[in-house]
Amino acid sequence: MNTLVLKIDAVLSKHLKKQLASYTISSQNTYVAFAAKKNGVTVLLYKSGKLVLQGNGANALAQELNLPVAKTVFEASNNSQDIPIIGSDEVGNGSYFGGIAVVASFVDPKDHSFLKKLGVDDSKKLSDKTIQQIAPLLEKQIPHQSLLLSPKKYNELVGKSKPYNAISIKVALHNQAIFLLLQKGIQPKQIVIDAFTSQSNYEKHLKKEKNHFPNPLTFQEKAESHYLAVAVSSIIARNLFLDNLDQLGQDLGYQLPSGAGSASDKVASQLLAAYGMSSLEYSAKLHFANTHKAQALLTK
């Protein structure tokens, strides 16, 4: 997917709106003055005058609309690494035990040599031991913002008749991590989120969040395999999640498994027998099916 970003004046903005009048879509982003989608390409015109085209046909649509692409456009493909980028990723959302760690990291081209020497890659391809070794080095060298939502707080916020669901809570965490990193004076040319939902759904949930920023976002599936900034965030987040899982286990006197398989059911049933439901409220995500499975194991 390509992302084209350019600055246009009021005259061209008016002309663009006229050309795309029959293709308009809604946008929950308060900084967007006009939004449209044509030929699979999302067009966002910001109040600042910045125009963003996202989609595989971005170049073709830009030419069709007679936009000054050659002079003012910045083009970013999946493999673009030669610009300063913020990348955001989360770990823990698929695990019954443990919280959710979300990290946004800022990687400048000058950091590439350091990162490659460390062997930074998709954290899902790295062993936990390797992650725990290199994460502290990344935290020291790379500007980043880490957030950890504990299981206890997660259970207060996520579930039926509660403020968030499993998707909207991640929108809130990613948005806050990026917002706080930008508040430190970071100036990225691109912000990439490892896509966990569609852009339209992300913006729908974003509407109820307090903090917003004008920078356009790029949503990329498996972004940690394409962007070093996202890979860095993935590694730091994984380490944060593992530390939290270990601490929760120490607090309860049990080794808590990662994931949501049968091992989690077994440990959860042991915790229920030893301490009752309060132990799962403290250490696990209650809305997962593992809770009912653990309760069923107690009756056998």
From Swiss-Prot:
Keywords: Cytoplasm, Endonuclease, Hydrolase, Magnesium, Metal-binding, Nuclease. Residues 83-300 form the RNase H type-2 domain. InterPro entries: RNase_HII/HIII, RNase_HII/HIII_dom, RNase_HIII, RNase_HIII_N, RNaseH-like_sf, RNaseH_sf, TBP_dom_sf. Manganese or magnesium. Binds 1 divalent metal ion per monomer in the absence of substrate. May bind a second metal ion after substrate binding. It is found in: Cytoplasm. SUPFAM superfamilies: Ribonuclease H-like. It is an enzyme of class 3 (hydrolase). It catalyses: Endonucleolytic cleavage to 5'-phosphomonoester. GO terms for biological process: DNA replication, removal of RNA primer; mismatch repair. GO terms for molecular function: magnesium ion binding; RNA binding; RNA-DNA hybrid ribonuclease activity. Its EC number is 3.1.26.4. Its cofactor is Mn(2+); Mg(2+). One of its GO terms (cellular component) is cytoplasm. CDD domains: RNase_HII_bacteria_HIII_like (cd06590), RNAse_HIII_N (cd14796). The keyword Electron transport does not apply. A divalent metal cation binds at residues 89-90, 194. The keyword Hydrolase applies. Belongs to the RNase HII family. RnhC subfamily. Endonuclease that specifically degrades the RNA of RNA-DNA hybrids. This is Ribonuclease HIII. It comes from Streptococcus pyogenes serotype M49 (strain NZ131). The gene is rnhC.
